[in-house]
């Protein structure tokens, strides 16, 4: 069977390398978050919600999906799970009954406060070598601009 690719192999394919790095990073974060009864996605949405609230934003599922650049249907499912766990509360917007507002419970806020430093420590260790490279963060930011 012949191999036809612009890249000489997996180690020169940026997409494949990004995929592998993402999988490795997510495994490390997921393992650490298990002790908090959170998946990586739950942590990201819970932390994003807390960040948005702390910065004076009214949080809806649509705004949370936009902020975290995730699918609205997935956000809806994850928020439902976080609500069942007692980490998030949903309520109707008094100004617009069609809109559901999100807020963190005390327990949800405590989960973020406890888990965030651990995830940040993992991020620092995992990305340390790449952060030494000039333009690493700006390169990632540039990738997100073209979505």
UniProtKB/Swiss-Prot annotation:
Keywords in alphabetical order = DNA-binding, Transcription, Transcription regulation
Q: Name one GO molecular function term.
A: DNA binding
An example GO BP is:
response to stress
Record's superkingdom?
A: Bacteria
| InterPro entries, per database record | HTH_MarR-typ, MarR/SlyA-like, WH-like_DNA-bd_sf, WH_DNA-bd_sf
Known DNA-binding region: 61-84
Q: Which part of the chain is the HTH marR-type domain?
A: 11-147
One matching Pfam family, short form? MarR
Supply the PANTHER family for this chain.
TRANSCRIPTIONAL REGULATOR SLYA, TRANSCRIPTIONAL REGULATOR, MARR FAMILY
Q: What is this protein called?
A: Uncharacterized HTH-type transcriptional regulator YdcH
Q: Which organism is it from?
A: Bacillus subtilis (strain 168)
Taxonomy of the source species: Bacteria, Bacillati, Bacillota, Bacilli, Bacillales
